[in-house]
A protein has these predicted regions:
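Intrinsic low-complexity, intrinsically disordered or marginally ordered coil/linker segments
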Residues: 2, 136, 140, 144-145, ...
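Short amphipathic beta-strand/extended segments with alternating polar/hydrophobic composition
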Residues: 19-29, 116-122, 193-198
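Short beta-strand and beta-hairpin "edge-sheet" elements
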Residues: 100-147
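Oligomerization/assembly interface segments of phage tail-like spikes and tubes
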Residues: 44, 52-82, 133-147
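Long, hydrophobic/aromatic-enriched structural stretches that serve as scaffold segments
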Residues: 64-110
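Intrinsically disordered, low-complexity segments enriched in serine, threonine, and glycine
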Residues: 149-223
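Residue-level detection of beta-strand-connecting loop/turn positions
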Residues: 13, 18, 111-113, 190, ...
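Polar/acidic, low-complexity leader/linker segments enriched in S/T/G and N/D
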Residues: 1-45
């Protein structure tokens, strides 16, 4: 709990699209809401039957993450190492950053440093002049429903007979890299999968695709 409280009181920082908010003199005013994604589900009402029939999928809808921000036009020391500049130039640089990046990008902040999301920015921010030298706005990113562990970027080596456990309560869809030759059996929750390999194979569980770089399709070698 103390670590969480310390994170909530930090000077906010966003990282997205290969850059971070402090590069543009952007200050995150407060911790964003911890919005949770909605489960994909369908509710059917049947005449003459009490209640509803519920069909729930093992999938969730996109969610959003919004940041209240200030664009700081103060001194170099006050703005985190950014040279003093006019507010309109700050706004131009800031919006160029947002609009020049396409598609889902890694989004992280220092409020939840152990996690990152995949998010895109679809536009619509209004930056207003407030107190002459400040710009005020809200950034809203559309995010995939998952929160990814930063620790998950570090490869874990597993040898014959070893097991791995998912550290979360949610379904994991890892990227598996197998080196060797012959038939390899991978068991996930008791369900076996056989991969016939020569040298190596990559299995992307998220995209349900087996391949070798640069673009060799290896799905026929998975059973």
């Amino acid at each position: 709990m103390p670590d969480l409280l310390n994170n909530l009181n930090k000077r906010g920082l966003i990282k997205w699209g290969g850059k971070q908010s402090s590069d543009y003199g952007i200050v995150v005013q407060d911790c964003p809401a911890f919005d949770k994604p909605r489960r994909k589900q369908t509710v059917f009402n049947v005449a003459g039957r009490n209640g509803s029939v519920l069909f729930q999928e093992d999938a969730f809808e996109d969610t959003t993450r919004s940041y209240n921000i200030w664009i700081d036009e103060q001194t170099e020391e006050d703005s985190g190492g950014i040279e003093t500049g006019r507010l309109d130039q700050r706004v131009a640089d800031f919006t160029a950053w947002l609009y020049s990046v396409k598609g889902y990008q890694e989004l992280s902040d220092n409020f939840e440093p152990d996690y990152y999301r995949l998010a895109y920015y679809s536009g619509g921010n209004d930056v207003s002049n407030e107190l002459i030298t400040y710009g005020k706005s809200t950034l809203t990113f559309t995010c995939r429903p998952e929160r990814f562990l930063v620790s998950g970027k570090t490869p874990v080596t597993v040898v014959n007979g070893d097991t791995m456990e998912n550290p979360t309560l949610f379904v994991a869809k890892p990227l598996i890299h197998i080196e060797g030759s012959g038939n390899v059996i991978i068991a996930i929750n008791g369900v076996g999968m056989t991969a016939t390999i020569d040298d190596y194979i990559n299995i992307d569980c998220e995209r349900m695709n087996a391949y070798r770089l640069p673009s060799e399709n290896m799905n026929a070698y998975i059973q």
